[in-house]
Amino acid sequence: MKDEKVYNGKKIKTDKEITNNKEISSDKDMVNNIEDRLWALRNEMDKHNMDMYIVPTCDFHGSEYMGDYFKAREFISGFTGSAGIAVVTKDQALLWTDGRYFVQAADQLPPVYKLMKQGEPDTPTVLEFVRNFANEKDKCIIGFDGKCMSSSLAEKIEKISNVTIVSKYDLIGKIWNNRPDLSCENIWILNEKYAGKSFGDKIKDVRLEMEEKKVDMLLITTLEDVSWLLNLRGNDIKCTPVFLGFIAVTGSQTALYVQRNALSQQVACYLEKNNIDIREYNDIYQDVKSIRKRRIWIDSSTANYQITKLVSKENYLYKAMLPTTKMKAVKNETEIANMKKAHILDGIAMTKFVYWLKNNVGKEKMDEISLGEKLEYFRGMAESYVEPSFEPIVGYNDHGAIVHYSATKETNYQIENKGMVLIDSGGHYLEGTTDITRTISLGKVTDKMRQMYTLVLKGHLHLGNAVFKKGCSGVALDILARKPLWDNGLDFNHGTGHGVGYLLSVHEPPNAIRYRILENQELNPTLKPGMITS
């Protein structure tokens, strides 16, 4: 017998039937589940007199990709893309996402949700929507989980005159009965022959930056920065070899807040040898609360609101991009040499795959999912291969137009010896990270396919062959890729290129190639030698 609760006279399911996606057998089941989840969430909102509850795509560290424990927005909306914010009021459910996911979101969201196409002229931003919503009320109470909300967005909402924020409740956690556990996988050491620079040398550079900015403490909250600084890697996020942790750096101390069960004796000894104080993962909040009369450097765009909220007003918060973010974006000579090796290894795997595909399509059964698995098989032949750098995007014919498409059993196309298949994939090697997209003709193609392929190829070649002046940013170069399309009244609704981490996130700020200038000027940097951009 299923557990049931009643909200406004309606029975709602609360057991694993509505919380475990493995139990979902059809699109109809998903719709019913999402509706039940919204009823349950609104019931929790009523208990705290909330007019609105915001569920961003976020973990405790502002990560782009995250572990299953943190997929609250997916749980409450059914949308599985990597970017988006769900907003739930007493009578509305809305989801904002960017142009990469318009097609996917329209397909996955149940009718009860309204898709808000982020960046479109007639679509308000989340902040604008919240402000307009609040202005219609004398007093507006807005809730969210402060540990899973960026400080920058939360502080903007907080400044709306008639808004009261309630950030201490994880309401999704209240209704997610079979929520996956917080990941706690083994942490491992990245040898200096791959990292190119020791922790000791990196921390010296960090402290020099701290002295220049006249700060007493640096709080590192992003997982990629934590891993990069320590020359450690982990397995807490699929396809991103990082681990859950925070770092606090002062002029004389470095403290790592981490789940101790993730530390082997070897890693613990490594940390001790480097004079790194090991503290419990969740102690960061109490320790931050106890700081007094210090200048603290923090990146409010990635640090969670709960951390910045706990910082006493006796302190001064210096809010800027972390020095580690800028440092790791510019690869050292060892990293560059290794990355070249990684791309050779990846090129070999891709060549073997394309050869196999061309020689076997139409002869043996294959589909979108099996193509991704086959490419993974060829990558796995390299001794230094670690894992995919993201879930492979294999889109046959019209599926190739869905920017971050992920094949499922329900959508999985059979591959035939005609048309085109787009494959966007990458790998993590000890020598670095790759990201490669290829569109492959499998036989007869239409004139339209041929035209689109040619225009995209022209843009790709123009950008790849670009010679540009020192001081250029990605915004200045973006037109080279788009011009052949623009000349024909066409475009693509997403960025052109992005930074790539070294055995870290395949999407690495701040360097990128896009036509939009971002509000945060630190994310519109000058391109520098050593920045690897895909």
Residue spans for each PLM region:
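Active-site neighborhoods and metal-handling regions in enzymes and metal-associated proteins
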Residues: 2-534
